[in-house]
UniProtKB/Swiss-Prot annotation:
Keyword Disulfide bond recorded: no
InterPro entries tied to this protein: Glycosyl_transferase_4, PNAcMuramoyl-5peptid_Trfase, PNAcMuramoyl-5peptid_Trfase_CS
Listed EC numbers: 2.7.8.13
Gene of this entry: mraY
Catalytic activity: UDP-N-acetyl-alpha-D-muramoyl-L-alanyl-gamma-D-glutamyl-meso-2,6-diaminopimeloyl-D-alanyl-D-alanine + di-trans,octa-cis-undecaprenyl phosphate = di-trans,octa-cis-undecaprenyl diphospho-N-acetyl-alpha-D-muramoyl-L-alanyl-D-glutamyl-meso-2,6-diaminopimeloyl-D-alanyl-D-alanine + UMP
Keywords in alphabetical order: Cell cycle, Cell division, Cell inner membrane, Cell membrane, Cell shape, Cell wall biogenesis/degradation, Magnesium, Membrane, Metal-binding, Peptidoglycan synthesis, Transferase, Transmembrane, Transmembrane helix
Chain segments annotated as transmembrane: 28-48, 74-94, 99-119, 133-153, 168-188, 203-223, 236-256, 263-283, 288-308, 338-358
Gene Ontology MF terms in the entry: metal ion binding; phospho-N-acetylmuramoyl-pentapeptide-transferase activity; UDP-N-acetylmuramoyl-L-alanyl-D-glutamyl-meso-2,6-diaminopimelyl-D-alanyl-D-alanine:undecaprenyl-phosphate transferase activity
Function text: Catalyzes the initial step of the lipid cycle reactions in the biosynthesis of the cell wall peptidoglycan: transfers peptidoglycan precursor phospho-MurNAc-pentapeptide from UDP-MurNAc-pentapeptide onto the lipid carrier undecaprenyl phosphate, yielding undecaprenyl-pyrophosphoryl-MurNAc-pentapeptide, known as lipid I.
Organism field: Rickettsia felis (strain ATCC VR-1525 / URRWXCal2) (Rickettsia azadi)
One GO location term (cellular component): plasma membrane
Protein name: Phospho-N-acetylmuramoyl-pentapeptide-transferase
CDD domains in the cross-refs: GT_MraY
Amino acid sequence: MLYNLLLPHIHNSHIANLFHYITFRSGLAIIITLSLSFITGPILIKFLRSLQKNGQPIRSDGPESHQTKAGTPTMGGIMIILSSCLSTLLLADLTNKYIWITLFGFISFGIIGFMDDYAKVTKNNHYGVRGKSKLLLQGIISLIICILLEYLDKNPSHLLNVPFFKNLSLDLGYFYIVFAIFVIVGSSNAVNLTDGLDGLATVPIAFTAGSFALISYLVGNLIYSNYLQLTYIPNTGELTVLCAGLVGSCLGFLWFNAQPAEVFMGDTGSLSLGGVLGIISVITKHEIVLAIVGGLFVIETASVILQVYYFKATKGKRIFKMAPLHHHFEKHGWAESKVVIRFWIISVIFALIGLSSLKLR
C-alpha cells in the first residue's frame, strides 16, 4: 500500500525513493512484524486463555514432561498470520499477482488449521478434524492456486529444476500441476508434524523463509538470475517482502513460544506457514531446494511414515520409541531444550546446503 502510494513520488523525495528498493521494504517488514508481535502478543495470549479453559489437549501417550504444558492456549498462529499479512499489504506492490495468490493460500491454509485447532479445543482431545478431510481441503486450495498460476502466467512453465546441476531440468508437462499440489500439501503437513516442542518449528521456518527471501529476490532479478544461471521469473522479487515478514513474525512469535511456551502456534500457524513456503517454492521454481533447506521437516515427516508402515508390516513393532523423531529423542532421555537447539543447528546446516545450490552448479 505504501509502495503504491509513494511510487509516483520516488523521483521527488528521498524517503519515497527508499520504498522503491525491495531490500529496504524487506528490512522494514521484519521490523514491523517484530513490533506487531511484541505489541499484540500479550493481548492475544490473554484473549486465547479466556476462550480456552483447558488450552491445547496434551497427548497422554507422549513424554511425561509434556503434561506440564496442560492449559497452554493454542491458535497462536493467528499472531503470525496477522502480522505477516499486514506488513505485506503495507509494504509490497499490491499490483503483483504473486503477492495475492500467496496471501490467498496463506490465509486459506490458516483457516483449515484454525478449524482443526477449534475442533481440538472444543472436543478436548488432540484429534481435531479428520485427516482425510484436511488433506482434501488442502488439495482443493492447492489446485486453485495452481490453476491461478497457469491462468495468470502468459507462458506457464512445467519445468522442474534440479539443483547442483547446470541447465538440468525435467519437463513434467501437465503432471507438474499434480507435483506442485504435492509440494504445497506436503510442505504444509511436514511443518505441522515438526511443531511438537516449544520453539522447535519456529526457528527452522524462519530460516526457510529467509532462504526463500533471497531466492525470490535473485530469481526475480534478471541480472542476478542470469549470473547464477537461475530461471528468471519476472515479478517474484516482491515475494522477498512477504518472506521477510514471515521471518520477523516467526521471531516475534518465538518470544512467547520459547520454553516454557506461553502459547502454541497450533495448526493455525503450522499448516499456514508450511503451505505458504510450499507455494513460494512453486512460484520460484525451487521445489527441490525447499526439500533441502527444509530438510528438518522432511526428516520429521519421514520418521512418521516409516514408523506407521513398519508398525503395520511387523504387526506392532516400532523403529522409533515415538514419532515424530523429536519425541524419540525425548523418550531417549534428551531434555526438550537440547532436542530443540540441536534441531535448530541441523536446520541451519540444511539451509546453508540449500543456498549453496544457487552457486554450485
